[in-house]
Amino acid sequence: MATIGKNIKRLRAKQGLSQDDLARKAELKYSTLAKIEGDFVKKPGVQMVAKIAKVFGVAMEDLLK
């Protein structure tokens, strides 16, 4: 089972975004996004997940699968 960090990284690569690009679009700190992708943050907040999902145009649940 993939982690939220791996799912974000996969979608980000698929859309050709850098971590910095995604962080800016989702209005998150680059360091926060890097920690989520690196699985240092196992359970990011709902608001963070919602912002990232919105950038990707997917449901929050898709990031959690």
Q: Language-model segments: what does each one mean?
A:
Residues 1-14:
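A short, Lys/Arg-rich alpha-helix, primarily the initiator
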Residues 3, 61-65:
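Short hydrophobic/aromatic patches at helix-to-coil boundaries
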Residues 9, 34-35, 64:
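Key DNA-contacting residues within the recognition helix of helix-turn-helix
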Residues 13, 24, 54:
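Alpha-helical residues within the helix-turn-helix
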Residues 17-35:
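Short alpha-helical DNA-recognition segment
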Residues 35, 39, 51:
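Alpha-helical DNA-recognition elements
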Residues 47-62:
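DNA major-groove recognition helix of helix-turn-helix/homeodomain DNA-binding modules
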